[in-house]
Amino acid sequence: NTDKQWHDRYYHGYDFIDKTHDFGATVVNIHHATGINPFINYPFLRTKEMNAYIDGAHALDMKVKIYNTVRELTNSCVEIFALRSLNGEIFSKGKGRGYSWLQEHYDQDYIAAWFAYTVKDAAIVNTGVSRWHNYYMEGLDWLVKNVGIDGLYIDDLAFDRMSMKRVRKILNRTNPGAMIDLHSANQFNEKDGFANSANLYLEHFPYLDRLWFGEYFDYDMPPEFWIVEVSGIPYGLMGEMLWEGGNKWRGMI
């Protein structure tokens, strides 16, 4: 992990691959709501474009990871109404609302999630472990083999340790150099039950390559805060700062 820390240079965003290379990046994280990954947690509708982008990156000895998890699911998912018909197995029940398309096409028994206005992408919240996880695993296997992705950028984990082990095995089987990065906002607040992000995801750390503990973390806090709340170093994990520019002096340490 230490060797990777000195070698890997991240570009966190979708841009021309030559530009990211000139910037000095060796790894690109492709978020959702971008040209080649427009729909959250459903990266199957722009696969030709994604493959071409990744081929260009590989030609420059760069890696490309994509945003893809199971926390919520886009309304652009081809199977969305079949999944909705499973009576709450895949999607959590709630008060509905959210983007107008959701209200017009779904019964009002869902929980509205992320909405990306640039691509009119509206998502609803998934339940815990379900058969959708098997779809996710098979889809990940297909993406590694046919699109050439080099790993995942996971925005908060919505599956268990066993699922993470499956993800790691799928990636390693076809692409031994593939990476898994975990991003989390600071969950020490009333809405999230005053949780510690590191403690919340600790069981997954052996399978990760890097932590991105971002929004609402105060990188200017004392060392004790860093060790307990921010740093993965006690567990052998390096990390990045993803909030208001971070603290570059502490980041160098």
Model-derived regions: residue spans:
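Aromatic-lined carbohydrate-binding/catalytic grooves of carbohydrate-active enzymes
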Residues: 2-141, 145-149, 161, 169
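Hydrophobic beta-strand segments of well-ordered beta-sheets in folded domains
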Residues: 25-28, 62-64, 150-152, 178-180, ...
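Aromatic-lined carbohydrate-recognition surfaces of secreted/lumenal glycan-active proteins
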Residues: 62-77, 153-160, 164, 168-205, ...
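Glycan-recognition surfaces
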Residues: 81, 86-118, 175-253
